[in-house]
Amino acid sequence: MSRRKQSKPRQIKRPLEDAIEDEEEECPSEETDIISKGDFPLEESFSTEFGPENLSCEEVEYFCNKGDDEGIQETAESDGDTQSEKPGQPGVETDDWDGPGELEVFQKDGERKIQSRQQLPVGTTWGPFPGKMDLNNNSLKTKAQVPMVLTAGPKWLLDVTWQGVEDNKNNCIVYSKGGQLWCTTTKAISEGEELIAFVVDFDSRLQAASQMTLTEGMYPARLLDSIQLLPQQAAMASILPTAIVNKDIFPCKSCGIWYRSERNLQAHLMYYCSGRQREAAPVSEENEDSAHQISSLCPFPQCTKSFSNARALEMHLNSHSGVKMEEFLPPGASLKCTVCSYTADSVINFHQHLFSHLTQAAFRCNHCHFGFQTQRELLQHQELHVPSGKLPRESDMEHSPSATEDSLQPATDLLTRSELPQSQKAMQTKDASSDTELDKCEKKTQLFLTNQRPEIQPTTNKQSFSYTKIKSEPSSPRLASSPVQPNIGPSFPVGPFLSQFSFPQDITMVPQASEILAKMSELVHRRLRHGSSSYPPVIYSPLMPKGATCFECNITFNNLDNYLVHKKHYCSSRWQQMAKSPEFPSVSEKMPEALSPNTGQTSINLLNPAAHSADPENPLLQTSCINSSTVLDLIGPNGKGHDKDFSTQTKKLSTSSNNDDKINGKPVDVKNPSVPLVDGESDPNKTTCEACNITFSRHETYMVHKQYYCATRHDPPLKRSASNKVPAMQRTMRTRKRRKMYEMCLPEQEQRPPLVQQRFLDVANLNNPCTSTQEPTEGLGECYHPRCDIFPGIVSKHLETSLTINKCVPVSKCDTTHSSVSCLEMDVPIDLSKKCLSQSERTTTSPKRLLDYHECTVCKISFNKVENYLAHKQNFCPVTAHQRNDLGQLDGKVFPNPESERNSPDVSYERSIIKCEKNGNLKQPSPNGNLFSSHLATLQGLKVFSEAAQLIATKEENRHLFLPQCLYPGAIKKAKGADQLSPYYGIKPSDYISGSLVIHNTDIEQSRNAENESPKGQASSNGCAALKKDSLPLLPKNRGMVIVNGGLKQDERPAANPQQENISQNPQHEDDHKSPSWISENPLAANENVSPGIPSAEEQLSSIAKGVNGSSQAPTSGKYCRLCDIQFNNLSNFITHKKFYCSSHAAEHVK
């Protein structure tokens, strides 16, 4: 290197800047694009980088000509030419080398090139060298391959061939770090190989970062294949190469807040800065500059301090409060306000007057309560409130402080007292003054904000701003933050967006790379958070915005969850009429009307067809019903209604009837009941809940809402008709679902036979579709039995039947073939404190009955375990029989005459399987139809229930029938009769002996044959009755005996009819006859499992013998929940657990 030093170092005697000035006349004017005195001083750049010993006049001339040549070379490279960009000087000798010894200069095509003299490994570094690099201005226009060039540096480094980052031919990198240049090889260079470099500036980050990191220059290109960008990210990534990596900060000197972007600072100055002036009108020529001067100059005489904002000036004025006037004012001076030409007589008055200009409440508008500093501004503002007032002129809008004052805030720091009068003299007219002042504001704002980035000059003007006071809800300028996506468009009208401040897309400048990367990362995090769910293309998408705006209530939420809660509970649109939108066609056009619970109705109105209409063609759709016990309570023993109960019942029933007359919020056409109605919940496309006025995006979400969260879950049960039921085939089977399991096997509608209508509570036909015109009107006292207890000292806890329990089929659902199913499917909230016993439970209930929730609603059998329940439903329940066998044909005799069988002791004996305890107590049927004979009338521990509650099923032929009426046990409370006066009426001797279970086998043919026989049971040696051979099972071949909870149950397979879910709850038939019970449950023997299959004859006999020998297990405590395996120490906690917390409610529709 020493032998290549400059041979004549003392050739340069004159200053470096003089040499450049001499050569400027010969250099083209484009030189200033690269070398500018304003960008960097020549003394600092050239004199320190090029010493006198290594710079000659020829080299200065070469460097001067280099600027134009580089611009031409850059354009050539943009056209695809990859040749070197620096034209060499043919007269330059190789002995002027100033670079490292491993390199040398050579001539190629008349240009100076740098090559290696020896083999160089990867990572060979030379430096540091003084120098400077800048953006290539031509590359921004022509998209050249070289975005950066060296504007100063050692001569040998300037001769290096430059290539773009994406070009894989480069073998070294020249970068700037700490204000110095370094050169490092990125590939192994062989001897004689040319150096091809690219430039990276690590200091100012003005580089093509994406080009460097995503190409083979520094990183392998195969990394691009593993990067998946969203469409929005790809668009943002396309502008990253030209984005500005912002390392500058933008402070607000008034508030002391630093902002990372100019946009944020501009918004702060316009809306949030404490030193801003909100509503100021244009001032006149003589005092227009004073409004600006007050924010920088102290108005006190002989005080030359200047401040950047009004807050600093206000704090400064406090220092003058204690100063006396004579200390301040020279002789002949006066205190004159520079804002309004007010002359004060004392310092105190002048001080108070100045504060009136600084406060916003000096002159306040009575209409909008905006404050103004001068009365003239207030008067001009009040013109806007005049109805016939003219709109503000464009010139007035240009003079508004939002255009001048706020834009001037950053620039006032650079203003001095001498500059302000010059700007005042330049304003001759009003329009000219506004234009000049605005332009000067913008220029000084740019000078203040971009003094560290001279290459960026945003060319904003007054058209970029909009100062119109328009209250609108625009879509966010940020694509990732607006609920109105630009590629979809809003589904609601949105006002025009008039930006109050300029955004980066409004300013012709390069966007900030930090904001682009922030938006890209925001998209990624939002995608990860919300997943790839499908949303309707209205407002929401998988890229959910951070916040949302309710346009009805004019509220913007920064959290989407808060917005959804608002729309569900608080939005005003929930109570307004809403039109159907094409996106959600199922939205009702009219909101459901509010129902008044005080609507008066009578007991006759409850039964008329106008209040209750049903659709016989659509069994799945039922209208409202009333409880059978309601009418009995209303009528009373003497035919007088109870006023208190009547008002309560009427309120509940009127609400339910009005509610159920509407299907999906639309009135039902009661004049034409034959028109089939569409079940809204069974519609797979339904997504709107009329009760809550919520439209869901998916039907599955809607179904979950209806099952767990709908407001109708908390309504009285009569308001929840069968139309609110979820279709059985649309729900998944759950093991703990006790009341809805049979829905999985419901037959099709066409398989259900027609139904014979029954009268309602023996009331004469009142033109109601629920009552039969062929039935005579009889007394209520002969049809129903009293509900009473015969245990001494035990009082029934709930004698009154509550309307909240709705297990029975009410009136107007009785004329459809699915009425009994609707009875069982009623969504009744479980209220154990008011739970009354069903018929089968009353037959077998003792004071220590077990509260169990695995109950077959068809057979009225409770189970202790889920496995027993499932085995019963799969193998033994009559409802499931149609899945294995064809439907049996209906018997000609629809309703048999069970009265003869009931009155025949012979039949009741032969059709019964008597189970005895070891004590030898025997029950025998009495000929008069009562429960006990006279010698058994004194037995203790027996509980009397009505015979109507014992009717679980009827004859085999009756299994084909679907009885339409379910009489609730409370319905017999008011009944009268001579027979019912007996304390033991309703209990047969074959039903109970010490809690043993007896199952009546009822076959109608055998009952007719045995009608005239009256055999008597004889006591055997073991104390049990001697049974006839044919009277023990007496089962048809298609039936099986099943041990259920310690008792026997008959199971009929082939002749079962699927429509017999409500047999167990029918207390009466035609001609007012009673049906004998054939099955009941025994909760005392509650731990035996259900037989999973059809037992053989031997198994049947052994099972019967086991029941006869009294092998039932002892009962467990009633305070133990088997489902949850929890033992409670008191009944109150147990009831609370069952009501609210038990796991049996997991599949229910109520809590």
UniProtKB/Swiss-Prot annotation:
GO terms for molecular function: DNA binding; RNA polymerase II-specific DNA-binding transcription factor binding; transcription coactivator activity; transcription corepressor activity; zinc ion binding. The keyword Cell cycle does not apply. Widely expressed at low level. Its main location: nucleus. GO terms for biological process: cell differentiation; embryonic organ development; fat cell differentiation; gonadal mesoderm development; heart development; in utero embryonic development; lung development; negative regulation of DNA-templated transcription. Coiled coil: none annotated. A zinc finger (C2H2-type) spans 296-320, 335-357, 363-385. Residues 829-835 are annotated as: Interaction with CTBP2. Residues 1-13 have a biased composition (Basic residues). It is found in: Nucleus. SMART domains: ZnF_C2H2 (SM00355). A motif (Nuclear localization signal) lies at residues 736-740. Zn(2+) 3 binds at residues 689, 692, 705, 710. The keyword Metal-binding applies. Changing residue 30 to G: In TOF and CTHM; does not affect its ability to interact with GATA4. Residues 1-102, 389-487, 636-683, 1051-1095 are annotated as: Disordered. Changing residue 544 to I: In SRXY9 and TOF; reduced its ability to interact with GATA4. There is a cross-link at residue 444 (Glycyl lysine isopeptide (Lys-Gly) (interchain with G-Cter in SUMO2)). A zinc finger (CCHC FOG-type) spans 244-277, 542-575, 681-714, 848-881, 1113-1146. Zn(2+) 5 binds at residues 1121, 1124, 1137, 1142. The CCHC FOG-type zinc fingers 1, 2, 3 and 5 directly bind to GATA-type zinc fingers. The Tyr residue adjacent to the last Cys of the CCHC FOG-type zinc finger is essential for the interaction with GATA-type zinc fingers. Belongs to the FOG (Friend of GATA) family. Interacts with the N-terminal zinc-finger of GATA4, GATA5 and probably GATA6. Interacts with retinoid nuclear receptor RXRA when ligand bound. Interacts with corepressor CTBP2; this interaction is however not essential for corepressor activity. Able to bind GATA1 in vitro. Interacts with NR2F2 and NR2F6. Interacts with ATOH8; mediates indirect interaction with GATA4. This is Zinc finger protein ZFPM2.
